[in-house]
Structures are given as C-alpha cells and as structure tokens.
Amino acid sequence: MSNLSLLDLGFFIAETAASPKHVGGLLIFKRPPKAPAAFVKNLYRAYLAATDVKPPFNRIIQFSMNALPHWQATDAIDMNQHVFYHVLPKGQADRKSVYDFVSKLHTPMLDRSRPLWEVHVIDGLPEGLFAIYHKMHHAYADGVTMSRWTAEGFSTSPTDMELTPVWTLKHGGYGTRRAKANNELLQMTWKEVTGNTRRFLGIGRLAAMLFLESIKLTKNAIALPFVSSAK
C-alpha cells in the first residue's frame, strides 16, 4: 500500500468526465525492412504476453471514509483491458485520420476500478507505418515522465530484438522522491480531521477545485500536447 501525494490526490478530486486527468503520447513508427504482413499484429500479441507488470502500472486507487486515499497493488490484471489493437479503415489512413482516431481514444476517463493505463497499437497506416498510443493517469506520471519512461523501453540497436514494454520496467524512485514530503504533510493534516469535519473538508476541496476549473484557472492545465525528444 502506498499513500497518494497531495498533488496526485488533487488530480482525482478535480477529475470529471468533461475534464479527465490523464496524459497521452502518440508514437509513429516505420516497419522494419522485409517485415511480415502480420508484424504489427504480432507486436500487439507480444504486448499482451508481457504480464510482468511493475509499479505504478499494477496499482489501483482506493478511497475510504476511514483511511487515507492510497494505491493498492493488484496481481489480477487483464491485459485485454489495457492493450488494444486497431486497424484504420482503408481510405482513412492519412495522418489527419490517425490524429482524429487517437483524439477519440484520448477523450474518455480511465476506469478507476483497474490500473489507470492503456496502450493502443494502430495498424493500417500508409507507407509501411504503424502507431502506438500510450494513455496513463497523471497521478502515475506527467507527460515528460511518461515520455522518458517510454524511451527507456526502446532498444539502442536495430539488432536488439528484446521487447521491453513500459509497464514491465522498474521505474526508480516512484512513490518515494516524488511523494515523500507531500505524504508526510497529508498524514499530519488527515490526523487532525475527524468525523463530519473530514467530510466537509473533502467536499470543500472538491468544490474549490471544480470552481477553479469553472472559471478557467485550471481547465486543460495538463492537457496541452507537446512533442518530446526524451532520452
């Protein structure tokens, strides 16, 4: 069990269907020379078989009226709920069609009943291209961190054929450096709050965050797209 930082808790409190708090990244690749027709589908199958899921990708958010919000690790991960395969229709495989398709994938909130991430493998692009779209909750990582984690899974040589999906890598320091100071403050504050006061605090915090969004002070604050060259 791992407690949330104040910042991460804020993302959950302010999250709504109209203002989801996840980040996404689109990667477009060229197939290797002489790759078989099923290369992209085989990549998807290899992703499904990569079931050694490391933190934070094995964590589910848990809320309770008598305990701190916290992450709960789970071994019951159905990869079919996290890894998806798509083929773009013929005639709709240009770059704009890819971007439109990914925007539809990006719109819905992630399901809080399971780990908060998805990977979509997209086939059918022209000129031997294919795409991979990553989606994960901002409480897991911000956009820059997601880009860095993804880059850590890339091979450094065309002869290196080992597949290392982002969810199978150990991400050093997760839940320690990022949250340690904030967690201590959260625990001290939470102990001072009991009964109805705790409920009012939660409602007040929620109202404040939603009010800030309603007057456009925080709306889309984490939804700005960017191009990363993370190494």
Ranges and model annotations:
Residues V40:
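Active-site regions of oxyanion-processing enzymes, predominantly non-cytosolic
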Residues M1-L7, L26-A37, R45-P55, R59-K231:
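Soluble acyl-CoA-dependent acyltransferase catalytic core bearing the H(X)4D motif
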Residues L7-E15, S19-F29:
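M16 family metallopeptidases and their MPP-like homologs
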